[in-house]
């Protein structure tokens, strides 16, 4: 292949990877794979400088602003850093800048694997925040940055203007928690903490960002009015004084040998840190000499990023173990030929879902490339098809649940396969906890500790077994005397008379919450009728969408679920909802807001009284609110209602409106 063609091919491939990495937050190759492409391109351009162009990945920072956010033009370009892949590269860097710099002392910092940001403060107050983007134009993420608690909205000391650069990252434990949550919901997981941080920071709704424990470190002053500094070490202390989050894991290094020692130390300690790092950043300490050295179009000449060697190992995929999660999700786990990786011996790895298995073309018997996502979770990066013998076997999703043999289902728009059997042994405890919860069958005294004992002692193997329990059996449980047992049996019996909407909620049908269960039970008054209805019938009901309808059809098509419902009926559990006559829809078209504590009604009871009469309960006050029902300690909702001159009712007035006084 001609040199010019190979250079063009490398640029196009890297631009594709830049798009997937920076814009979609879904990398197609590992960082080390990308670095190899960059090294090859750099080498070719050095040998054939006539082919260097202004838009080559070696000449600019990768990435561009997403169209979802307002673009922000950086007052000072946010450049990238040149990479060093060996200690020899660092020594060469030291020699190169030694030709200009008179004092070769450095600041060594950890290279956080996150998202670069620029923060601007005016008169000590956070004005705006932007991502790096292409180095010249980034994305305005101010609203989301404000949700990160480590970033101060006001500095300890006021300066006319301060612009700093930093990195937003996701701690390892939050990365694990978030991916577990996404797996339980049947959603695609994040590949690594960097992508999780990017995906969380670039949410259109700041509340989503706030729900994810992002953190940040600030490491450079880009511009400052009202203060002059001489060294990076001094800048670090000054940023700390201002209350900005600086990483304590930094070191002033008198020479390049001290830098090498710092790098060696953290190559060993990196797995002990609560966040992911992929190298060490080395910066000339003297700021005036940085000015003399200057920068290329892509990177400063006075700094370099040493990248740790990729911790990846090859091993063989021996088989796949299929497990059922607590919410019924079918989860594949890779069984591997044991291999030592990043401090531990690895013999198993999460495969997340069958879509990823297909995308990566993983087969039983394959040689695969393994790494640890977030330095913690073993994960297969890719298969190595060039090493196949032809005897490898394709991995396919199971048709039946491995725990209970029920048919598995998959919903539109989800990557997960699920077991729909509510009595599946793998998900029984969670099903029971939800069934007994306040918003469902509301069985007082039946908490997780009691359920744990009931299931572990085989006293409850299915949901309907709850209604077969005897007082003397419960008395034998730990911390359950005769009085507690009698109260629990009473609560179980009382739950039999709950309305159909509560039972539909309690069954834990995917996408069917308390509100949609109430809507369904207003239109369909007998649980038996759900057996006959298809998606088209259900979507004709107002507010019931295709996902809800599909979920209902799948649930009632499962024979084991039908059996449970029939047994619940036989045991005296109500499965009907009385049809409400048109005349009884007293509150049709009326919107209520509840605030404060009512003397005798819980908020849930008041809500049910409103909804059963055709009214709607809202969580916020507006001009469209018909009534505000206020109890003790009502808070700001009452203030707003008074401001808007809305009708305000106490409990007595509310009951009178309903004809229950």
Swiss-Prot record:
It comes from the Bacteria. GO terms for biological process: DNA repair; DNA replication. GO terms for molecular function: DNA binding; DNA ligase (NAD+) activity; metal ion binding. Keywords: DNA damage, DNA repair, DNA replication, Ligase, Magnesium, Manganese, Metal-binding, NAD, Zinc. GO terms for cellular component: cytosol. It catalyses: NAD(+) + (deoxyribonucleotide)n-3'-hydroxyl + 5'-phospho-(deoxyribonucleotide)m = (deoxyribonucleotide)n+m + AMP + beta-nicotinamide D-nucleotide. The active site is at residue 111. NAD(+) binds at residues 31-35, 80-81, 109, 132, 167, 283, 307. InterPro entries: BRCT_dom, BRCT_dom_sf, DisA/LigA_HHH, DNA_ligase, DNA_ligase_AS, DNAligase_adenylation, DNAligase_N, Hlx-hairpin-Hlx_DNA-bd_motif. Zn(2+) binds at residues 401, 404, 419, 424. Its EC number is 6.5.1.2. It holds the Pfam family Nlig-Ia. DNA ligase that catalyzes the formation of phosphodiester linkages between 5'-phosphoryl and 3'-hydroxyl groups in double-stranded DNA using NAD as a coenzyme and as the energy source for the reaction. It is essential for DNA replication and repair of damaged DNA. Belongs to the NAD-dependent DNA ligase family. LigA subfamily. This is DNA ligase. It comes from Syntrophomonas wolfei subsp. wolfei (strain DSM 2245B / Goettingen).
């Amino acid at each position: 292949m001609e040199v010019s063609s190979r250079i063009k091919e490398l640029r196009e491939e890297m631009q594709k990877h830049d798009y997937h990495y920076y814009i979609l937050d879904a990398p197609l190759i590992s960082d080390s794979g990308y670095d190899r492409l960059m090294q090859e391109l750099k080498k070719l351009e050095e040998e054939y400088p006539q082919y260097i162009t202004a838009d080559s990945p070696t000449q600019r920072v990768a990435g561009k602003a997403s169209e979802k956010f307002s673009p922000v033009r950086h007052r000072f370009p946010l450049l990238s850093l040149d990479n060093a892949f060996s200690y020899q590269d660092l020594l060469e860097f030291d020699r190169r800048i030694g030709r200009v710099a008179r004092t070769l002392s450095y600041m060594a910092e950890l290279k956080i694997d996150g998202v670069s940001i620029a923060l601007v403060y005016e008169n000590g107050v956070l004005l705006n925040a932007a991502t790096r983007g292409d180095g010249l134009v980034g994305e305005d993420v101010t609203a989301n940055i404000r949700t990160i608690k480590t970033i101060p909205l006001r500095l300890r000391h006021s300066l006319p203007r301060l612009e700093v650069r930093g990195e937003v990252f996701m701690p390892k434990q939050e990365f694990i928690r978030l991916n577990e949550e996404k797996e339980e919901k049947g959603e695609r997981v994040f590949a690594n903490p960097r992508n999780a941080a990017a995906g969380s920071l670039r949410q259109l709704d700041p509340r989503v960002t706030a729900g994810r424990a992002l953190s940040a470190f600030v490491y450079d002053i880009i511009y400052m009015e009202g203060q002059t500094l001489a060294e990076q070490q001094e800048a670090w202390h000054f940023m700390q004084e201002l209350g900005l989050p600086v990483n304590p894991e930094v070191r002033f290094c008198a020479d390049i040998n001290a830098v090498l020692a710092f790098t060696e130390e953290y190559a060993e300690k990196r797995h002990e840190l609560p966040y992911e790092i992929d190298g060490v950043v080395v910066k000339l300490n003297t700021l005036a000499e940085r000015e003399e050295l200057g920068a290329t179009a892509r990177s400063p000449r006075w700094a370099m990023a040493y990248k740790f060697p990729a911790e990846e190992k090859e091993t063989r995929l021996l088989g796949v173990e299929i497990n059922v999660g607590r919410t019924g999700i079918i989860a594949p786990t890779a069984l591997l030929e044991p291999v030592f990786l990043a401090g531990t011996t690895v013999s198993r790895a999460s495969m997340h879902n069958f879509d990823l298995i297909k995308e990566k073309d993983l087969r039983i018997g394959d040689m695969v490339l393994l790494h640890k996502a977030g330095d913690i979770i073993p994960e297969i990066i890719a298969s190595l098809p060039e090493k196949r013998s032809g005897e490898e076997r394709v991995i396919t999703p199971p048709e039946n649940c491995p725990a209970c043999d029920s048919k598995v289902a998959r919903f539109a728009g989800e990557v997960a396969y699920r077991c729909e059997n509510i009595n599946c042994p793998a998900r029984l405890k969670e099903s029971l906890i939800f069934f007994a919860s306040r918003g469902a069958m509301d069985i007082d005294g039946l908490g997780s500790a009691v359920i744990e004992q009931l299931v572990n002692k085989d006293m409850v193997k299915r949901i309907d077994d709850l209604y077969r329990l005897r007082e003397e059996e419960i008395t034998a449980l730990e911390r359950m005397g005769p009085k507690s047992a009698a109260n629990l049996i009473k609560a179980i019996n009382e739950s039999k008379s709950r309305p159909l909407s509560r039972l539909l909620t309690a069954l834990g049908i995917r996408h069917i919450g308390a509100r949609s269960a109430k809507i369904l039970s207003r239109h369909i008054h007998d649980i038996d009728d759900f057996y006959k209805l298809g998606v088209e019938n259900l979507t004709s009901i107002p507010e019931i969408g295709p996902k809800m309808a599909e979920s209902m059809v799948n649930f009632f098509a499962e024979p084991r679920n039908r059996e449970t419902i029939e047994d619940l009926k036989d045991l005296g559990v109500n499965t009907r909802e009385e049809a409400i006559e048109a005349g009884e829809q007293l509150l049709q078209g009326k919107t209520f807001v509840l605030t404060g504590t009512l003397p005798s009604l819980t908020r849930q009871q008041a809500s049910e009284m409103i909804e059963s009469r055709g009214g709607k309960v809202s969580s916020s006050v507006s001009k469209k609110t018909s009534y505000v029902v206020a109890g003790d300690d009502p808070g700001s909702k009452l203030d707003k209602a008074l401001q808007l001159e809305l009708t305000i009712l106490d409990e007595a007035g509310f009951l009178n409106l309903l004809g229950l006084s």
